[in-house]
Amino acid sequence: MILANIIPAQQLNDRKTMNKRRLTKQQQNRINAKQNENLILANGSEQNQGLLIASYGKYADILTANNQIVRCTLRQNLPALVVGDEIIWQAEQAGLSVVTALIPRKSELFRINYQQEKKLIAANLNQAIIVMAVQPDFSEFVLDSYLAAMALCNLKAMVVFNKIDLLNSQQLEILHQRAKLYKEIGYEVYYLSCILEQGLSGLKTKLLDNISAFIGPSGVGKSTLIKQFVPEESIVLGVISEATNLGRHTTTTSHLYRLQTGGVLIDSPGIRGFGLGKLARQQLYHCFIDIKPYKDLCKFRNCEHESEPDCALQQAVKTGKISLSRLNSFKKLMAAE
């Protein structure tokens, strides 16, 4: 043994003290969190898997495997969590339980602002149901924007025209004609009336064994639709946390409901409107499934699809392969680049 390399105990302790002083607050928090985790494991606390159904800052409501709701605090080293996240949580003997880990997400529902910042809204969906009210008259551009946003998220989308009881027979026929192009593109379209209980069974079938979100502008009847599919006791569960004053969520917090018939439904005020940000042109082509096949067929690479010669999109409109309203929506979003 080389005695010169042996560090005296007091000197070693002094070095540890100096190193500890050099630790940043963030580093110390990480160490403390890891120590707490080890302490919990040492005490034999059980690791549980759960589903985040609502979030309130430092707290979250977790749906357990036996369909109980547990209020948890969030481990500091976790990323921002959203409704639909699958997580690992641990029960505490004293105080609130704690969320300790995030299970990798299968999909993300998000929007992008003009600062190109990604705003995560929900996780692990496999379909989005875009709800449009027929009165007042819906906008094709708004609908196309929602469809483009879902394509950007790589989510299957379907369209619901709600409140059709407000239309007379002539207006209903016009609606069917306007919606026809979306069916031709490949989107599933449903016509609903909660008052007449019309069209609900067909949509209910689509909710089975899926994780779905109702998306659409305010005032289109999403809340009324949710009541048609969500058991009353589940809605009550979503209101539990109001009594704790840990988060008033009537207008600001997303909620997840488990359907009695199977499947999960997400309702969120945060998905009333979507921004696509400044999408690159190639990204925008990807968001319009009917226009995407023509993206490399124009004569000019920077074609604006107006009056340029040999514009593939204008030619497709003339031959009826693309609707003029869809092209106009595409160009309007393209102008926002």
Where are these regions (language model features)?
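Phosphate-binding glycine-rich loops and their immediate beta-loop-alpha structural context
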Residues: I121-N124, A133-G186
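C-terminal effector/interaction modules appended to NTPase cores
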Residues: I2-A151
